[in-house]
A protein has these predicted regions:
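C-terminal transmembrane bundle of multi-pass solute transporters/carriers
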Residues: 5, 10-17, 47, 54, ...
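Pair of pore-lining "gating" transmembrane helices in MFS-fold secondary transporters
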Residues: 55-75, 162
Length: 288
C-alpha cells in the first residue's frame, strides 16, 4: 500500500495464491503412515489429535502461550487501521508502514530464533516472549491514555508494533518443534490439525473482543484487556508447562506381557524412552 493501491494489492495476492497452489501440486509427498490406534471409530479419528494435545503438559502450555499471542496479534490486525486512519487521521500508506513495523519485527525474530533455540530451551524462550507481549500491551495501554494523537504517538506505535512482532514470532515459531516431539510420526498430522483448530479458538475469542472494545469503549481499554488476557495466558503456561520437560521418561507397563513388541523394542535398554501419548501411553507419567 505504500506504492500501489489496494485493488492491485489484492490482485497480486490472488496471483500469489494461485502460484502457491501450483507449487504445492508440483510436489510429490510421501505416503502418510497409518495411525497405530486400535480405535478406528469416526469419533476417535476426529478427536485423536485434540486428545493427544490436551493430555501432553507441554502442549497445554503451548495453548496458553498461543492465547497470549492471539491477544497481541488481534490488537495489531484488528485495530491498526482504526488507530492510524481514525485516531491519527493518516493515510493508507501509513497503515501499511505501521503493519510493516510489526512484520519486520516478526521476520527479524524468525531469522535469529534458530540460534537462540540452540542455546535456550523452548519453554524459556516462549514464556519470556509471552511476558514481553504482556509488557508491550500494558505499556501501549498506558501510552494511549497519556499521549495525544499525533506524530509522536505514531512513532511510539511503530516501535510498539515492532516489539510485539518480535515477541509474537518468538512465542509461536517454536510450536512446530514442540508438536513434532510430542507425537509419533503417524499421529503428527492429527496433532498439527489440533493446533490449528485450538489456536483459531483463541483468535475467535480475542478478535471480536478487541474490535468491540476498540470501537465501543476506547483503544486504551482494548490494549488493557488484551494485556490482561496475555498475562492470563502467560501465567497459565507457566503453571501447565513443567520446567523439567525431558523427552525420555522412565515408566513401566505392568499390563503388557513380557514378550510384547513394545517392551522388546523400546524398553530393551532400560525403563525410559521418548514418551508421547498413544495407545500404549494413554496418560502422562506423573499426572495427578
Amino acid at each position: 500500500l505504500t506504492v500501489i493501491n489496494f485493488h492491485w494489492l489484492f490482485s497480486g495476492t490472488a496471483v500469489g495464491f494461485i502460484a502457491s497452489a501450483l507449487l504445492v501440486l508440483s510436489v510429490t509427498l510421501p505416503r502418510p503412515e497409518r495411525s497405530s490406534s486400535r480405535d478406528t471409530s469416526i469419533y476417535a479419528k476426529t478427536t485423536r489429535g485434540i486428545r493427544i494435545y490436551l493430555k501432553t503438559p507441554r502442549l497445554r502450555g503451548l495453548l496458553a502461550v498461543t492465547l497470549a499471542a492471539a491477544a497481541a496479534s488481534s490488537m495489531v490486525i484488528v485495530n491498526t487501521v482504526v488507530i492510524v486512519r481514525d485516531r491519527l487521521g493518516m493515510t493508507q500508506q501509513d497503515v501499511a508502514l505501521t503493519l510493516a513495523a510489526y512484520g519486520f519485527g516478526s521476520m527479524a525474530a524468525a531469522f535469529i530464533l534458530p540460534r537462540i533455540l540452540d542455546r535456550i530451551p523452548d519453554r524459556r524462550v516462549m514464556l519470556l516472549s509471552a511476558a514481553i507481549l504482556v509488557a508491550g500491551l500494558a505499556a501501549l495501554a498506558w501510552i494511549s491514555s497519556i499521549v495525544p494523537a499525533g506524530m509522536t504517538y505514531w512513532y511510539v506505535l511503530l516501535g510498539g508494533w515492532a516489539v510485539l512482532g518480535i515477541a509474537y514470532s518468538m512465542s509461536i515459531t517454536p510450536s512446530g518443534r514442540l508438536l513434532k516431539r510430542s507425537a509419533n510420526a503417524q499421529d503428527r498430522p492429527a496433532l498439527f490439525a489440533a493446533q490449528f483448530a485450538l489456536s483459531h479458538i483463541c483468535w475467535l475469542i480475542t478478535y471480536p473482543l478487541v474490535g468491540q472494545l476498540g470501537a465501543g469503549v476506547s483503544m486504551t481499554a482494548a490494549f488493557a484487556a488484551m494485556a490482561a488476557i496475555a498475562l492470563f495466558g502467560t501465567l497459565l503456561g507457566l503453571l501447565l508447562w513443567p520446567a523439567s520437560d525431558p523427552d525420555a521418561i522412565a515408566h513401566d507397563h505392568p499390563d503388557l506381557p513380557a514378550d510384547h513388541e513394545h517392551l522388546r523394542r523400546q524398553h530393551a535398554g532400560g525403563a525410559s524412552h521418548p514418551y508421547v501419548i498413544d495407545d500404549l501411553h494413554e496418560r502422562w507419567v506423573g499426572k495427578p
